[in-house]
Amino acid sequence: MAVPVVEPERYEAQLDAKRERVTAQFARFSPPALEVFPSPPSHYRQRCEFRLWHEGDDLFYAMFEVDPSDPKRKEVIRLDDYPVASERINALMPALREALLASDVLRRKLFQVEFLTTLSGEALVTLIYHRQLDAAWEQEARALQTTLGVSIIGRARKQRLVLDRDHVWERLQVEGREFVYQQVENSFTQPNAAICQSMLGWARDVTRESREGDLVEFYCGNGNFTVALAENFRRVVATEISRTSVASANVNLEANAVANAVVARMSAEEFSAALAGEKTGRRVAALALDEHTFTTALVDPPRAGLDAHSCEQLKVYERIVYISCNPDTLEANLEQLSATHVVTRFALFDQFPYTDHCECGVLLERRAPAARA
């Protein structure tokens, strides 16, 4: 992949290009005017990972770019700073590098560094090695942890040493409210926190008149949307298959005093089967699905989007909130969903400036019977 070049002076131009591209791509669905949410033009990414490149006595952060003259060859790009990343990450990069240069124990066979930071300045650093970590490493890593004011995790094959904690606490400001989120190392979190705040605000806005119904959320992760949307609904059932994410989502529900939501460790397909009465068992019984009236579904699928069967299952809901990280798969899914639903809100979130990546939000509402295709 190409290393993004941060040029704040061309930020608006690149955002306008995305706006035009997305507007043209989805024109045939006759959506309302596109709502556009800009990113900070620099220092917008709260998590990053870098290779640690060793050259003699030197070492430096690196990324790789494909050589245009030889697609099979990757060029090593040295990074002394990274304007894409948060200011906290940029402050840590040289301080950590200097500490590594001064310690044979910490630098030996270190090949990757991962940073996870928050808007409030918390930081977690993961050091990944091609060797097993011992007591000498732990002693020096603990000293480094204190010097840098961060939490440190050491990783190697079949080894994970958590010196302090394996997470940070993010605090997001949305519509005058503060939501707190435990974000666990090596699990998915929204990388652009400013845009995440915009996404949560938009999702709250499009579901505001929903208190008489219940929400089902698929692919809920650590409860990012679950926490922010719960007060808009009578009850919420959120599904997720990752044990780590389910545990973190439950922590976040408790941290935000959300009492009307539950997280079920099951796939979207399993939930749909349970809702249809085709799947039973202890976990299904605990959800008491027959006591719910699900009027709204929220989906935030991976880049592959939804398969045809999943789209069919969504058609039973009055409203669908679709958060997409891939306009092409969103377009394909809307082709199927538009037979029964119409796009009534449409948003572009500039999650990754200076790249072709577009994050979109769509609200679909069921067509009147006579209007269905």
Swiss-Prot record:
Query: What Gene Ontology terms describe where this protein resides (cellular component)?
Result: cytosol
**Catalysed reaction equations from the record:** uridine(54) in tRNA + S-adenosyl-L-methionine = 5-methyluridine(54) in tRNA + S-adenosyl-L-homocysteine + H(+); uridine(341) in tmRNA + S-adenosyl-L-methionine = 5-methyluridine(341) in tmRNA + S-adenosyl-L-homocysteine + H(+)
Alphabetized InterPro entries for the sequence: MeTrfase_TrmA_AS (IPR030390), SAM-dependent_MTases_sf (IPR029063), TrmA_MeTrfase (IPR011869), U5_MeTrfase_fam (IPR010280)
Q: Which SUPFAM superfamilies match?
A: S-adenosyl-L-methionine-dependent methyltransferases
PROSITE patterns, per this entry?
SAM_MT_RNA_M5U, TRMA_1
Q: Which residues bind S-adenosyl-L-methionine?
A: 190, 219, 224, 240, 300
Q: Which residues form the signal peptide?
A: none
Gene Ontology terms for molecular function: rRNA binding; tRNA (uracil(54)-C5)-methyltransferase activity, S-adenosyl methionine-dependent; tRNA binding
Q: Catalytic residues per the record?
A: 325, 359
Question: Would you say which domain of life the source belongs to?
Answer: Bacteria
| GO process annotations (BP) | tRNA methylation
Keyword set for this entry? Methyltransferase, S-adenosyl-L-methionine, Transferase, tRNA processing
Per the UniProt record, which EC number(s) apply here? 2.1.1.-, 2.1.1.35
This molecule's function is given as: Dual-specificity methyltransferase that catalyzes the formation of 5-methyluridine at position 54 (m5U54) in all tRNAs, and that of position 341 (m5U341) in tmRNA (transfer-mRNA).
By sequence similarity, the record places it as follows: Belongs to the class I-like SAM-binding methyltransferase superfamily. RNA M5U methyltransferase family. TrmA subfamily.
Q: Which NCBIfam families match?
A: trmA_only
Q: What is this protein called?
A: tRNA/tmRNA (uracil-C(5))-methyltransferase
Question: What species was this sequence derived from?
Answer: Chromohalobacter salexigens (strain ATCC BAA-138 / DSM 3043 / CIP 106854 / NCIMB 13768 / 1H11)
